[in-house]
């Protein structure tokens, strides 16, 4: 048996084992009062939402169409260059590993 097969089998058995263990636990009702973790999550979520709204408002105030077009053009050119060089690097790496 190959190492990959044993690893895949181990992972499948591990997931199934956790599923079986999770099924044995009885369902608990949610506590009526929010826990500290829930309060912290809600607080952080509200801070994040307010920060997003402030950033969106600032963006809408300072929006310049010409700058936006330049940024989009720069982004498309840079991603094209990166994908080209990543393809060349991948080719070289595969050639090096494969060997002719």
UniProtKB/Swiss-Prot annotation:
Keywords: Chylomicron, Glycoprotein, HDL, LDL, Lipid degradation, Lipid metabolism, Lipid transport, Secreted, Sialic acid, Signal, Transport, VLDL. GO terms for biological process: lipid catabolic process; lipid transport; positive regulation of phospholipid catabolic process. Residues 1-22 form the signal peptide. This is Apolipoprotein C-II. Belongs to the apolipoprotein C2 family. Component of chylomicrons, very low-density lipoproteins (VLDL), low-density lipoproteins (LDL), and high-density lipoproteins (HDL) in plasma. Plays an important role in lipoprotein metabolism as an activator of lipoprotein lipase. Both proapolipoprotein C-II and apolipoprotein C-II can activate lipoprotein lipase. GO terms for molecular function: phospholipase activator activity; phospholipase binding. The gene is APOC2. Proapolipoprotein C-II is synthesized as a sialic acid containing glycoprotein which is subsequently desialylated prior to its proteolytic processing. One of its GO terms (cellular component) is chylomicron. PANTHER family: APOLIPOPROTEIN C-II. It comes from Otolemur garnettii. Residues 66-74 are annotated as: Lipid binding. InterPro entries: Apo-CII, ApoC-II_dom_sf. Residues 78-100 are annotated as: Lipoprotein lipase cofactor. It is found in: Secreted.
């Amino acid at each position: 048996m190959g190492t990959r097969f044993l690893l895949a089998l181990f992972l499948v058995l591990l997931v199934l084992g956790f599923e079986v263990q999770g099924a044995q636990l009885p369902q608990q009702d949610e506590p009526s009062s929010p826990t500290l973790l829930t309060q912290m999550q809600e607080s952080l979520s509200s801070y994040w939402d307010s920060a997003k709204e402030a950033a969106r408002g600032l963006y809408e105030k300072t929006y310049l169409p010409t700058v936006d077009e330049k940024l989009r053009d720069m982004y498309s050119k840079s991603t094209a260059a990166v994908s080209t060089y990543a393809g060349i690097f991948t080719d070289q790496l595969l050639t090096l590993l494969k060997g002719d």
